[in-house]
């Protein structure tokens, strides 16, 4: 069940020990003011329809702890300790006063927070934060963005990137060795001393063969194929022994059963590539612990292939939104029309222009934009026409403005936790990416406030100089 909190607490009502004075211009104090906690709490309470049972942690504590973790890159245990020790973080998490006598919650609760705050819930929270921030903007700027006479207006910038997961770079031999070790652990669990003699696994010999391969400085194709064949034989024997135990009415729990299915899938894929002398297979598994991760071919310098979630974002007036995400590789050009329609649902009209990379300029997207009066940036398809006079100044401005989405990617990967996703589950990894987008918008609000203070300070200094001169 969920119990509503008493609402946002002002800094003056925050109970502080004698001699402690919190500053109003602290960034965490400003972040509290920029988030519509009451509206978000109404959505969060819908996740707990039951009116009985243990009371869930308040929304401000759950979301605040997740934001703090993304901001600093703390572990679950360190996040709990930092909240216990810092009065600013406690105020951000909705505490009524500073209290360092006990931990705010157990560190394992962070996993439940990430599961409850799904990407869909975080997308709604992100939209509420954007709408709340837009209300405080100058009304003249809002009127300028509205179309006159129901036409198109505004600009949307789109691009795709990959949020890499924290996995070892996959190699066939090391992947098979890890699968073999996991299969041996499952066999140890299924075997009991009353069953008699334990099935032979040759684990010492398999380990010796694996170390012989990895300790070699140069790996030839013949050597690699021989090592893969040996590991496949060892793994085949282990799986046969596990099947024999399961036929004797032995049972595994849910987590162990899922791990066994992953091992079987790895064996099938590696056996197929070994028999057919190929290095590619559909839905290839690259990690035993995270079987949902897929290789994403990016073609970037230094990183031709990344392993993690691929995502599309859109930037409108500096506000970032997560449009699409998937662990499977896909062509981002197929999602452009969906992103434009999402813009139409939010704003009530289509954008006047779309700034995108060349990969988005296919025939379907060009005809779609032309039918709706939208200008898609970039050159036309095919060879340049004879005597064509392109507006180079317009192309240069479009390219300069399109760089904003690259800045969002850079900031999200360097400062918001998108650069290396350490979550182990598919749902929690998606939570990390969605929360990074929310943190990007909170940083934008904070930077806008600091710019306003600099402008106000400069205005006051100029007035003082005028008074001194007079």
Regions found by a protein language model. Give the residues of each.
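Charged, often Cys/His-bearing segments associated with DNA-binding zinc-finger transcription factors
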Residues: 1-35, 447-470
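Basic, short loop/linker segments at the boundary and entry of helix-turn-helix/winged-helix-like folds
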Residues: 22-67
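Short, conserved catalytic/metal-binding motifs centered on acidic residues
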Residues: 26, 65, 79-83, 104-110, ...
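Trp/Phe/Arg-rich N-terminal binding region typifying the photolyase-homology
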Residues: 47-59, 72-115, 122
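Acidic, metal-coordinating catalytic cores used for nucleic-acid/nucleotide bond scission
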Residues: 52-57, 87, 355-363, 383
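Active-site- or DNA-interface-adjacent structural scaffold in DNA-acting proteins
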Residues: 96-290
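Basic, amphipathic alpha-helical segments enriched in Lys/Arg and hydrophobic/aromatic residues
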Residues: 256-260, 267-274, 393-470
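Electropositive, glycine- and tryptophan-enriched low-complexity nucleic-acid-binding patches
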Residues: 300-346
């Amino acid at each position: 069940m969920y119990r509503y909190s008493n609402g946002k607490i002002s800094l003056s009502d925050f109970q502080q020990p004698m001699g402690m004075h919190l500053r109003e211009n602290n960034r965490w104090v400003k972040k509290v003011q920029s988030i519509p906690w009451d509206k978000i709490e109404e959505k969060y309470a819908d996740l707990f329809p039951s009116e009985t049972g243990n009371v869930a942690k308040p929304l401000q504590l759950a979301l605040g702890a997740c934001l703090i973790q993304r901001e600093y890159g703390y572990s679950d245990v360190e996040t709990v300790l930092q909240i216990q020790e810092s009065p600013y973080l406690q105020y951000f998490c909705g505490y009524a006063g500073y209290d360092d006598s006990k931990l705010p919650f157990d560190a394992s609760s962070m996993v439940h927070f990430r599961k409850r705050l799904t990407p869909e819930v975080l997308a709604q929270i992100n939209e509420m934060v954007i709408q709340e921030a837009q209300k405080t903007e100058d009304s003249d700027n809002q009127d300028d963005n509205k179309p006159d006479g129901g036409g198109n207006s505004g600009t949307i910038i789109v691009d795709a990137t990959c949020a890499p997961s924290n996995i070892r770079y996959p190699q066939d031999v090391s992947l098979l060795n890890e699968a073999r070790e996991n299969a041996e652990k499952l066999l140890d669990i299924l075997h009991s001393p009353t069953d008699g003699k334990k099935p032979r696994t040759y684990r010492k010999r398999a380990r010796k063969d694996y170390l012989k391969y990895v300790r070699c400085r140069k790996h030839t194709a013949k050597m690699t194929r021989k090592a893969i064949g040996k590991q496949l034989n060892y793994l085949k024997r282990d799986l046969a022994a596990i099947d024999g135990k399961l036929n004797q009415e032995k049972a595994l729990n849910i987590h162990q059963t899922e791990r066994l299915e992953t091992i079987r899938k790895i064996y099938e894929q590696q056996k197929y590539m070994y028999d057919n002398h190929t290095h590619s297979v559909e839905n290839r598994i690259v990690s035993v612990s995270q079987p949902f991760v897929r290789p994403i071919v990016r073609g970037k310098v230094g990183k031709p292939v990344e392993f993690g979630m691929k995502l599309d974002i859109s930037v409108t007036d500096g506000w970032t939104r997560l449009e699409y995400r998937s662990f499977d590789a896909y062509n981002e050009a197929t999602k452009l029309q969906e992103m434009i329609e999402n813009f139409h649902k939010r704003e009530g009209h289509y954008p006047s222009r779309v700034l995108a990379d060349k990969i988005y300029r296919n025939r379907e997207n060009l005809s779609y934009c032309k039918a709706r009066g939208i200008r898609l940036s970039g050159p036309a398809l095919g060879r340049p026409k004879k005597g064509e006079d392109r507006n180079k100044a317009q192309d240069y401005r479009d390219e300069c403005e399109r760089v904003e989405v690259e800045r969002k990617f850079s900031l999200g990967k360097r400062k918001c936790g998108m650069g290396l996703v350490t979550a182990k589950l598919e749902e929690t990894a998606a939570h990390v990416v969605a929360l990074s987008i929310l943190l990007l918008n909170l940083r934008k609000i904070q930077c806008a406030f600091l710019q306003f203070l600099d402008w106000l300070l400069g205005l006051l200094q100029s007035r003082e100089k005028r008074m001194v001169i007079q």
